[in-house]
Amino acid sequence: MSPRKTYILKLYVAGNTPNSMRALKTLHEILENEFKGVYALKVIDILKSPQLAEEDKILATPTLTKILPPPVRRIIGDLSDRERVLIGLDLLYEELSGNEFLSSIASPNSDEDN
């Protein structure tokens, strides 16, 4: 069994809005279920720290940035779609074996072979 990767994440929000709170709650649930404590999440309120948003070129909130493991990935906007978040963090792809992935992209329209 390979050692678990440590995920370093930043979540940029704009104040204590319902959208920001929903993003944080959903993300926390995903992280606890998928990472089981092998992550670090830094929440950055761009209203309180606009210089951090400028340095990291954040143009919209919420924005989730995966710093480690590489490559760096960003998910911008609604984080309520669990599958979208997992794909953005490269977790869903890692869960698929090569055969599952190939069969899922090769078999949607089996009529095309005729």
UniProtKB/Swiss-Prot annotation:
Gene3D superfamilies, per database record: Glutaredoxin (3.40.30.10)
Keyword annotations: Biological rhythms
Alphabetized Pfam families for the sequence: KaiB
InterPro entries per the record?
Circ_KaiB, KaiB-like, KaiB_domain, Thioredoxin-like_sf
GO BP terms: circadian rhythm
* HAMAP family linked: KaiB
Domain comment in the entry: Has 2 forms, fold switches to a thioredoxin-like fold (KaiB(fs)) when bound to KaiC.
Cited function: Component of the KaiBC clock protein complex, which constitutes the main circadian regulator in cyanobacteria; it may modify the ATPase activity of KaiC.
**Which additional comment does the entry carry?**
The kiaA gene has been eliminated from Prochlorococcus during genome streamlining. It has been suggested that the central oscillator in Prochlorococcus does not have to be as robust as in other cyanobacteria because the former live in specific niches of the Earth's oceans; they divide exactly once a day and at the same time. Thus gene loss and changes in kaiB function compared to other cyanobacteria, can occur.
Q: How does it assemble?
A: May undergo a major conformational rearrangment; in the free state forms homooligomers. When bound to KaiC switches to a monomeric thioredoxin-fold (KaiB(fs)). The active oscillator complex is probably KaiC(6):KaiB(6).
| Recorded family membership | Belongs to the KaiB family.
Q: This chain belongs to which protein, by name?
A: Circadian clock oscillator protein KaiB
Tell me what gene encodes this: kaiB
